[in-house]
Amino acid sequence: MAVTDDRQSILQLAQKIIHIQHSVDFIQIREKTKTVKEVMTLLEYLDEGGVPKEKIIVNDRLDIALCSGIQTVHLPERGLPVQRVKERFPHLKIGKSVHDYMGAKEAERQGADYVLYGHCFATNSKKGKVPNGLTPIIEMKKSLKIPVFAIGGIQVSRVQALHDVQADGIAVMSGIFSAQHPFAEASEFKEAIQNANKL
């Protein structure tokens, strides 16, 4: 999963997403400072660029997902309650950000389709905050029936470690969208995941 970093223009972002679309399974649109109109314009660009709606996840903005026909919404830890959204819009897939085992269990209880756990490693987007490490993933995988994705400081060299704790997937932000060559980085992550799965 590639997660946008809210640091680029809509046009720049659209070009990067279209370019990397075949190297990632999902693209999470996490543009907190953009207006509704800007994000809707971005989604129009992606549609014109051939990015399947099934690959797109909208962060937090339920209204945008509903208006654009996007089927997956990712809710922040302090965002809308999963259960309430599921009851009102049962056709949507819902992801939830969590930072510990109990948060993940509660998200699953409320009906989340997956959880995004972090931050796993030190990262520039969380400067000064101690990473949560990988141990909670091990705990989650023992009891959760929904997929657990890992985020935060994810680098190609760390893919194997995440595979070893049975994370179902990874989410990468700056490692792709802040990279000088996003397509090359996305391709490297894809190759690392494929190699880890062969072991």
What does each of the following model-derived ranges do?
Residues 1-114, 139, 145-146, 155-160, ...:
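Conserved N-terminal beta1-alpha1 strand-loop-helix module at the mouth
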Residues 26-30, 116-122, 170-172:
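Short beta-strands and strand-loop turn motifs
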Residues 63, 135, 171:
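Active-site phosphate/pyrophosphate-handling residues
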Residues 65, 121-127:
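A short acidic, helix-capping loop that chelates divalent metal ions and anchors anionic groups
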Residues 119-120, 133, 153, 175-176:
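Residue-level preference for alpha-helix termini and adjacent loops
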Residues 127-132, 137-138:
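Substrate-recognition "cap/lid" segment bordering the active-site pocket of phosphatases
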Residues 149-154, 170-174:
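Glycine-rich beta-strand-to-loop/alpha-helix junction loops that act as flexible
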Residues 165-168:
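As written
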